[in-house]
UniProtKB/Swiss-Prot annotation:
Zn(2+) binds at C13, C16, C31, C34. GO terms for biological process: nucleolar large rRNA transcription by RNA polymerase I; RNA polymerase I preinitiation complex assembly. Residues 71-73 are annotated as: B-linker. This is TATA box-binding protein-associated factor RNA polymerase I subunit B. It comes from Danio rerio (Zebrafish). One of its GO terms (cellular component) is RNA polymerase transcription factor SL1 complex. Keywords: DNA-binding, Metal-binding, Nucleus, Transcription, Transcription regulation, Zinc, Zinc-finger. One of its GO terms (molecular function) is zinc ion binding. Disulfide bonds: none annotated. Residues 137-157 are annotated as: Disordered. The lineage of its organism: Eukaryota, Metazoa, Chordata, Craniata, Vertebrata. InterPro entries: Rrn7_cyclin_C (IPR048538), Rrn7_cyclin_N (IPR048540), TAF1B/Rrn7 (IPR033599), TF_Rrn7_Zf (IPR021752). A zinc finger (RRN7-type) spans 6-39. Residues 247-357 are annotated as: C-terminal cyclin fold.
Amino acid sequence: MDEQITGGYSEPCGQCAAVDWGVSDEGQFFCKSCHNVIEKIREVEDVTSLHHKHGRISIVRKPKKKKHDSEREWLVCEGFQFILKHQAKALVSLGVCMKFETEVLWNFWKRYLQNTRQAFTENPVSTARFEVFMKSQSGSESDTQSHQSCYSEASSDTEMSVSGISVDGRSAVSSESLHSIPQKGRRGRVSNLMSMPRTLAMCYLALLWVREAITLTDLLRMVAEGHIPYLHLHETFPAEMRMFGKDVQIFRVLFFPSYAFIKKEALVLAKIMKLPSFPTISQDCLFHPVPLTVRYLLEANLPDALHVWVQKVITGAGMDSDSFLTFDPTDKKPHLLSYDVQAVAVIIVAMKLLFKLDDHVEWKLSHDAAKKKNNKVFSLERWFNIVQPVLEQARLKEEQEEARRQWNFANPFITNLKRKSLVLKKRRVTDHLQQRFQKFADPAPEQSTSTTNSHTSFRFSWGEEEGSDGPSMFNQNLDCTVKAKAVNGLANQRYWHPELRICPENKCVSHFSKFEPSLPRMFVWVLDLFSFILGVLQSDVYEEVLNVERRFLKKNYRLDSRLTSSHLKKKKGPIL
C-alpha cells in the first residue's frame, strides 16, 4: 500500500540519503531507514468532483512545534514582578531608601498576589468552573490551552483578561504565558488583575508609605523622561519569557497614563490589597503642604514673602491637620489627596488674595511697584514678562521631545504567525522611510537631554548663574501689595471666585471648559503655568483651586476679619 502512494516520490532522505519512504496513519511521509518525518504532499482522488479523474486534494500535515529547552510556561504575574523589580531598582538608584524596595513594595506585591489569589494561597484563582466555561466556548481547543486559561477573577459571571480587551472564548491562549485571557467580562467590569499603569500606581503607594519626597507628578515625569523603566520594558525580559499572542496586549504601552488615572488605580489597588492606614503626614514630611508650597514657589519664581499668606490659607482651610492629610484606605470612602496639585492650588488662592488676578488690580499694583525706587519690590507684570517666554520655550522643547519619542518596539510583536511576513515587511518599510526623512529634515538631530542628563525635580532654574532660565524674584518683598494701614492688611479688598456649587456624588465632571472663556486671562495663564510645571491638565488645577476655596471660605467667611471683608458684594461671583 505504501509503495503505491510513494512510488512517484524518489527524493533521497535528508538525514540518511536513503530512498525508502512510508506513509503513517496521519498521512505523513517518513523514512523507513531513519524514521525522519517530512512535510510531503499526499495526493488523494476527489471522487465528489465533476472532474474526479484529474482532481486531486493536497494535504499537508506539519509536525507539532517542538518546544525549545530554554522555553517554559510562565505566568503573567511573573512578568509584572520582573517589571516592578526594575522600576524599584531605578527609584533606589535615584535616591529612594532601600526600605522602599526590600520591605514596602515587596510586601505590597505579596499582599496583592495573595488577595487576588494568584499566589501565596491554598485556593488559587484557577477554578474548575472557569475551565469548563472555556471548554464550552471552544471545543476545538486542547486541554493544555484550557488549563492555561486560568488567569481570572473569582466572580460569578465575568470573563477576565490582563490586557483589558474583551475577546471570546475561541481566542484563548496562543502564547507561552499561562494567563493570557480576557480581563473585561461580559458586563465590562474591571478585574483585579495587574496592568502596566498599575505598576506605577503600586510604586506611588509604596513611595507614599515611606514618605519619600517624590510626588505623583515627579513619578510620571521620571517615567516620561526614561529614568524609570516603563516603555518597551518587555524587551528586557529573560529569554525564556518569550512573548507571543495575547501577551502582546498585556505589556504593550502605547501612551503614558494620566495623573488622574494613576491616582484612581492607586485607590483601587489600596482597596484590593486591604492596606491599613498610611503613616501620618506631619509637617516634617515633604508631602505636607507647608514645605511642598515652598518648592513650587521656587519653581514658579514667586517671592518667598508670599509663603506667609500661603500658610494663612492652609491654616484657614484646615488643610494642615494630620487626619486630613493622611491616607486611610480603611475609611468608608477613602480619599487619596493630590498633594502636589493641592499645593499649587493653595498658592493660586493666596495670589488671588493679594493680586486678585482679575486683569485689572494686578496691573495697577504692578504700576505702583514700578514707581518705587527699590528694585526689591515684587511686580507681577515683571514676573509675567520673565516667566512667559521661558514657559513657551519649555513647552516647545517638550513638544519636540515628544515628537521624537519612539513608540515602536525594537522587535515587532508577532500576534499571528500568518501575518508575520506582512508585519516584518511593514516594519522594514517604516524604518527605511523614517531614516530617509530624518536625514532630509535634520542631518544631525540633537540628542534629547532627558535621557543624557541626571534627573532634577525642577523644570526651571532661576538665578544669576550660567545656564539659568532668568533672574530670580524669590527674595523680593510685597510692599505694594500688603498695606499696613488697610482694613485687612491687603491692598486688594475684594476676593472673587467662580461658582462653588458641589456636583452630585458620582456625577461630578469638570466645568473648566464651560467657564474658561469668562475667566480672567491672567488667572487662566497662572493655571496654565502651574499645570505645565506639574504636567497635568488645567482643569485638574482649576478643580483643586475650587476645592481649596470651598474649605477656606466655609471656615473663614465672617469669622476672620483679617482675611475677609465685612460686606458681601457681587462681582464675577461672590466678593469678600
